[in-house]
Structure formats: C-alpha cells, structure tokens
Amino acid sequence: MNIALLGFGTVGKAFYELTLGRSDLRVTSVLSRRPRPELPCTVTNDFDEIVRDRSVGIVVEVMGGLEPAYRYICAAMRAGKHVVTANKQLVCAHYDELLELARECGVSLRCTAAAGGGIPWLTSLSRAARLDEITAVGGILNGTTNYMLSAMTTSGVDYTTCLREAQALGYAEADPTADVEGYDARRKLVLSANLAFGASVREEEIPCFGISSVEEKDFAAWRELGRVCKLFVRAERHEGRISAFVCPTLFPAASPVAQTNGTGNLVTLRGARFGELSFFGAGAGGYPTGSSVLSDCVDVIEGCPSFYVSRHEAKHIDNSAVAGRFYLRTGSETVCTGPIIVAEAFARAERALSCGEPVFLARIEEE
C-alpha cells in the first residue's frame, strides 16, 4: 500500500527508513516545506496534491500541533484514505469527532505512537479491554521528565542544568512546557483512559502537576524517606466513576517504578480478572516511535477496525473518592500529609500558588 508521509523530522525520517525494502508498504510522497533531493519519492508542499492522488492508501501524520494537521487528516479521511498519526495533542482535542469521521468514511484511524513511544501500549490496552473489565491504568509515560528526574536523583544536578542537558541530547524540546508541566503525560493518560474504559474524557478536567518547581532540597528529603520521585499518571474506574490525575509520585526506592530510569516508560493496566500487566520500553526517540507508526500501518493493511474501541461514552472526571498521602512543600512549610482526598491536595497547592508561594506537590505511594 502506498503511503503519504506528512512531516520529515526525527520520527518521519525514522519511519521512512523503516519502510525501505518492504514490499507491502511504500512511502511514495512526502509533504515537506523544503525540497528533499535525497528522497527518490515525490516531495511536495501542496497537501491537496496528496488528497487527489488515488494511489495513496495511508496518510501518516507526524507533523505535530493542531493546525494544519487537523485539517489535513480530516481531508485525508474524507478522501477515503486511512490515517496513522503520532499526534496526541490532536487526537485528544478532537477525539469524538475523529472517531466518528473515521467510521463515517469507512477508514482506519490509528495512533499507537501517541502514547508509549516504542511500547505497543494502546494496542495492548485495547485488546485487554476486549477480554476483561479494565479497572485501572497508570505509569510513567513521559521520557523527558523521567530522564530529568533520574539524573537529578543520581547525580544531584539542579533542575535548570538538567533541563539544558536534556535539550542538548534531544530529549527535551526548545519549549519544554508540555513535558515538564505534565501536559504531554496528561494527553497520553486521556487516550489510555478512553481506550481502557470505553470513555471520552476531557483533558482539561484532569488535574495535573508537573516537575518544573522541583528543588534539590526535595530530593534530599526524599532520600531520607527512602523514596524516588517519578512523574506518574493514573486513572481508575469504580462503580461507573472515573478518577484521573497526573502528579509527581514518591515510590519506594527498590520498587520497579523507581528503578525505571532514563527515557524509559513503564505503564500498567489492571483487569478485574487477570490482574496487573506491565509494559516497559523506550518512551521516546525516532526509531521507537517510528516503529509504532509502522506497526499501525501494518495493522491497517491487515484490516484492523476503524479505531481501537467501538464505543466512547462521555465521562466526567471525579476524584472526590480517591485519597492518598502527599508531600507538599510551600514557601512556609514542608509536610507529609495523612490521607487526604486528591482534589484537596491539588487545591492546597493551588491556594499556595495563588499567594505567590513556591510549591511542589507529590503523592506518596503506599508500600
């Protein structure tokens, strides 16, 4: 099947290389803003040319951002072309609409690379959801912050220096906001919760606290507690309600989560009958992400359904019944709370922030 590739950055290049030599999939056109004389295929800056090309069966979108990616993939589906995307921001923002459009047009929409990098997380999660009731998902789903927290834990380097190192290595973007504030991880949690629970949840309803305010004294305090900090996502379903939040979390130093270092991702699902299943792998990088894009393309030519799940019921996030202990540092005190409702923990942090205080919030995982 012929593929049109939208975007030729790190992931786009890796995906292109992974398709070379295959007889079942061929990149025949690339959408690029500049000429690419090194490529033997058609290179164009006119997307309409791709839409009109009836020989193109799959459009692979690795441009990122909301526009023009949204307009492009909608036009591709309306033209009867399957779509594979790594764009978590886009799929989260237009989840219901894109699923319905794929069904109406009789095409496949796949986004495995949008969560988990090289881990086949979304495909594994959707298969598990067909076998059992999934009651919880959670894990480390952002390679940038995991690299930074790992480095700060082991070497004692400060946040600013560590961020610069991550940017120099290509692990962090020039504007790292989406990663360090937890927004990237939250979007991956939205996709995970939607597939696990057959739901449609809104990103803005999920409370989120990132790592940008972490300080060296926090790591010193955690060492005394025998804990290691990870940016962790979690969502649970109980009696029809869905709870979800993103927050730095303190794990016992010997636990598998605490031992997941570098850009690695570790994510777990819990089934009502089969218990917990965990997945570990590279959470970022051209080839790991490109391999997930390629896997989606193979699924398309093998006749996968239009999307991972057949239903998506709108659900509101309800954290009112979820409690835990928290580490809270403000300008005036550092405390480890007793069990409190998650919503109250985030509210305390927000109140301190509104007063202009420096704040760091982390959940303390029970042993």
Where are these regions (language model features)?
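A conserved regulatory-domain signal marking ACT and ACT-like small-molecule sensing domains
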Residues: C297-D299, G303-E367
